Structure formats: structure tokens, C-alpha cells
Amino acid sequence: MNKSKEDLLDSFFRDINPQWQAEIPELSAVFEEERFSPGERLINDWGELYLIVDGIFGKYEKTCPVRYALAGESLMIPNHKHRYQFIALSDCRTYRTSLRQLEEINAHNPKVFYLYANLTDKQQTYLDYRHKLLSLNNQDKFDFVFNKYPDLRSYVKHNELAQFMGISSELLRRLLRDHDC
């Protein structure tokens, strides 16, 4: 059964504000569905917000992976000059809006600010994940990554995965062998 746009958006907003549909009825209208094929890049417009319904994206600083974003997570394009690229690693379905559209709603309905602030906090949590990963000892990195991303090896090459984990390709190969993956 296909879920409606409102049901899909609800999965992102209900934990923040269970009454969002009644209190901010205009919110769903500013989100547009966008689909991406593997290898396709997100439009890198400052302040864009993507809610990932299906699929997985990679966030890269130049060519270095800094984050993987899964269905149920959001991606915010920084509102300043940056060197990030956001690339679909699988077939992806998103809902996209802009900071400008959210500001327009916020001008007459300040409840949008709370939603946006909460999504911004979640972005920081996503970024903190990689910092935590890099601070772990090498033996603990394997479980830390594959508990969150059990299927990641299906989407990224071995060398990229090692780079994301901050370990050598040889060590990753040994960890994979030891874990019988």
C-alpha cells in the first residue's frame, strides 16, 4: 500500500510535534517529491532540506566520505559556501524544500521554527557520529559502523569504506574476514 505524502512526512515530524498537521497545515505543501538514481547528485542549493523516504546517500568532502544518510534521516545542505557533494548510492526517494520556504511559513506560523531547530539538532547528531567513529580504537570501528549501516558494503567500494572508518584497506579486509562477512 502506497503511503500518502502526509503519512510519509509524518514519520519525520511526529516525534518533534505530533500535532504538526493541524498546527502547521501549510507545511506539507512546500515539500516536493524528488527521485534520484545511483550516482546522481543532489542539487547543492544552500539551505535545501531533503527528507529521505527511501534509499541511501553519501556525503563527501571533495572525495572523502563524511556521512551516509539512510531512509528516515534528513540531509541539510549548508547555508554557506562548502565543498560537500551529496550523491545517491541507491535508488532514492526524497521530499525537498528550501529554507526560504520554511521562513515564509515561519513569518506567520512560528511553530515551524521548532521543527526546523529540531531537524538542525539531528544534523549535528549525524555529524557527531563520524567524529565518534574516528575516535574509537580500530577494533571497535567495525561493529560501530555495521550496527548502524548493516548493508553499507552493498553501496560503497572497499577503499571508500576504509576511508570512512579511518582505517587502512588491509585492516578492513582483516576485520571483515574476522567477522565472517
Question: Positions of the model-derived regions?
Answer:
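Cyclic nucleotide-binding regulatory module and flanking cytosolic helices
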Residues: M1-E33
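Short, Lys/Arg-enriched N-terminal segment that forms or immediately precedes the first helix
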Residues: D121-L134
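Cyclic-nucleotide recognition modules
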Residues: T63-D121
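Phosphate-/nucleic-acid-contacting segments
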Residues: L136-N137, D143-C181
